[in-house]
Amino acid sequence: MPIGVPKVPFRSPGEEDASWVDVYNRLYRERLLFLGQEVDSEISNQLIGLMVYLSIENDTKDLYLFINSPGGWVIPGVAIYDTMQFVRPDVQTICMGLAASMGSFILAGGEITKRLAFPHARVMIHQPASSFYEAQTGEFILEAEELLKLRETLTRVYVQRTDKPLWVVSEDMERDVFMSATEAQAYGIVDLVAVVE
């Protein structure tokens, strides 16, 4: 039996009675954002809207983006990354579970020194993929050119965010490279690994 999104009580300032809101809406009020699915236009637009709204509401208080994502579409992922760089508050990124593909790109996009992975989290980088098998020859060539541009963009951002040499990142993006939390820290995708006490 599906339970849906859990509801929690929330009382707005000045109100006597609490109302029931879904848990994510309650957490958004604490500036806690979640990417817990494949990256697509819908979740990208939701996160961008929340980051912009919360940065207008208070431009000095950090935002926290929790990531557990298998990756997804490149352009919506880059839009999230660009918004993280654009908003005034620092965006802290936290990897819980998996940050693969665009998930790891967004994870690396957090404020440097404020990117964290849980101890058993996994991170994966690779090159962007395409749907070549669906394209005809002319479209195939145009799509290949666009894919090369996107790959170059992603590679340069990883180089900038990790301080790894271009040749290392380029070589690693040739295939799926999975990392533990400590390996992702050594690579420069995250700055800290959470410690369980």
From Swiss-Prot:
One of its GO terms (molecular function) is ATPase binding. One of its GO terms (cellular component) is endopeptidase Clp complex. GO terms for biological process: protein quality control for misfolded or incompletely synthesized proteins. It is found in: Plastid, Chloroplast stroma. It catalyses: Hydrolysis of proteins to small peptides in the presence of ATP and magnesium. alpha-casein is the usual test substrate. In the absence of ATP, only oligopeptides shorter than five residues are hydrolyzed (such as succinyl-Leu-Tyr-|-NHMec, and Leu-Tyr-Leu-|-Tyr-Trp, in which cleavage of the -Tyr-|-Leu- and -Tyr-|-Trp bonds also occurs). The active site is at S101 (nucleophile), H126. The keyword Transferase does not apply. Keywords: Chloroplast, Hydrolase, Plastid, Protease, Serine protease. It comes from the Eukaryota. InterPro entries: ClpP, ClpP/crotonase-like_dom_sf, ClpP/TepA, ClpP_His_AS, ClpP_Ser_AS. Transmembrane segments: none annotated. Its EC number is 3.4.21.92. HAMAP family: ClpP. Component of the chloroplastic Clp protease core complex. Belongs to the peptidase S14 family. Cleaves peptides in various proteins in a process that requires ATP hydrolysis. Has a chymotrypsin-like activity. Plays a major role in the degradation of misfolded proteins. This is ATP-dependent Clp protease proteolytic subunit. It comes from Daucus carota (Wild carrot). The gene is clpP.
